Amino acid sequence: MRAKLGGVGSRGFLLVILLVFYVMTYFHRVMTGVMKSEIDHIALKNNIDLDLLLAVLTSAYFYAYTLAQLFIGVLLDSFGIKRIGSLFAIIMFAGIFMMYFMSPQSLILGRAIVGFSCAAAFLAYQRATSLSYSREMQGRLTSYALVVGNLSAMVATYPLRLALNAAGLKTLLELMMIATLVVAALLYLTTKDSGTSMQGGKLVETLSHFRHLVRDPHMWGLSAASIATYGTTLAYQSTWGQKLLTGPFRLSLEVSSQYLLVLALTFTLASPVAGFLSDRVLVRRKPVITLAVLTSTASWSLMLYATKATSTEVLSASLVLLGIASGFHIVAPPMAKEGYDAKYSATSVALFNMILFSATAIIQTISTLLDPYYSIIIQLIVAIAGTALVTIFARETLKRN
């Protein structure tokens, strides 16, 4: 299986391309977090409720991303990164092009298409790492993806706000279209992986594995932990966080984006620490994901107090803890595929993502329409539930030999 991805140099180059692809998907994922003024302008121009357009535009990405998980993992495992990865990069280009027309309808449809296509990036990366590297490296390799993803998330905070002020949204979309075409071409021209269909495998076998995963309690407990950590963080980061910061805390859009930058920076720094701790120190996964959900619970508790007391100092502490919780959740994708055949790795992570991002989309939609104080209470309840479920159902997947 590993030979299909080429030697050390070629497999490393493939990971670089896939990381660039993932950077683009992550940027799309969180960019709406600082676009409130642009979205409000379009809503007012078209007589649409401001909060409703923000909620729908943001969650459109995640509902489509979730839908795509149903079959992109199976397609990647069956037909490989070369064909499926490059195809979905082209679909991403089409979505960005649709957004370029700047009407509410084209923005929502385009963002949904982008979200649909983005599902291929992380799943392709997880397939490539499973086929090319040992299980003991999966935590660190996943942390690399989250690090570069969060670097793009950092760019999508205060720097993006400055860029939008200077050049506008259309210029940004033009640059993103060019970058997407380059990634699509590189994936098709340089990748050798053709999936199990070219190696005597059958699509029905992959679907059978998917059904087995659905019945596994481990997958549901693990997904609950990720919803409690990364899901709640992402909902805050990409939608309702700016409402909290500009509302109860009365911060400007520019200052609010700086607070979101702190969250992304902490997430970035915590991810490789979690990967190293899991792979090399503990040589275990479950203690790390358990620590993540406990930290998330503490973070939302602090944020609830900070909002009631209008304390920016306590708010800052809660955001740092939230970043740590999200960073430590990076052991979850390896846990979703370890213990199963590596050739089905994309399918395994796809189901995990489907549960995670469907819940995230629902949390986003509800939280954006509520008063921020009650939104925090919802996140806290989710974090507590995630702690209980991961403790009961998730199993250790990386054990000492």
Which functions belong to the PLM regions below?
Residues T32-V34, P217-P272, T360-Q364, T368:
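Extracytoplasmic gate region of multi-pass secondary transporters
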Residues L67-P104:
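Conserved MFS/SLC helix-loop-helix module at the cytosolic interface between two early adjacent transmembrane helices
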Residues F13-K45, Y236-Q242, I363-S367:
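Extracytoplasmic
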